[in-house]
């Protein structure tokens, strides 16, 4: 084995297997491209993105970690979302972060 090498088993790995998925159309109404990362709480994304923010509450993009989706000005895209995992708390992404996403 080479130091740092990864040895994977046979077959494919499905990311976010078993996660509830939500599809939403998003359009960039601004005049510049907007890029949003994989683990951003989607409702807190750039204000130039037009979509149902209430429906997206508690969700992130269903894309691999460390990647992003780019929204070009005036272009609508259908995106797939999955629920944020872990402690489901969002802090500091905007001036009004929601904190705990689930009522307790």
Curated annotation (Swiss-Prot):
GO terms for biological process: urea catabolic process. InterPro entries: Urease_beta-like, Urease_betasu_sf, Urease_subunit. It is found in: Cytoplasm. Its main location: cytoplasm. One of its GO terms (cellular component) is urease complex. SUPFAM superfamilies: Urease, beta-subunit (SSF51278). It comes from the Bacteria. It holds the Pfam family Urease_beta. It catalyses: urea + 2 H2O + H(+) = hydrogencarbonate + 2 NH4(+). Heterotrimer of UreA (gamma), UreB (beta) and UreC (alpha) subunits. Three heterotrimers associate to form the active enzyme. Belongs to the urease beta subunit family. This is Urease subunit beta. It comes from Mycolicibacterium vanbaalenii (strain DSM 7251 / JCM 13017 / BCRC 16820 / KCTC 9966 / NRRL B-24157 / PYR-1) (Mycobacterium vanbaalenii).
């Amino acid at each position: 084995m080479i130091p740092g090498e990864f040895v994977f088993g046979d077959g494919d790995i499905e990311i976010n297997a078993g996660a509830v998925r939500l599809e939403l159309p998003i359009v960039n109404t601004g005049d510049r491209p907007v890029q949003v990362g994989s683990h951003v709480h989607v409702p807190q994304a750039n204000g130039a993105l037009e979509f149902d923010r209430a429906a997206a509450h508690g969700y992130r993009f269903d894309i691999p970690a460390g990647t992003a989706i780019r929204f070009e000005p005036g272009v609508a895209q259908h995106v797939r979302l999955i629920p944020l995992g872990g402690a489901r708390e969002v802090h500091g992404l905007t001036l009004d972060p929601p904190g705990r996403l689930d009522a307790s």
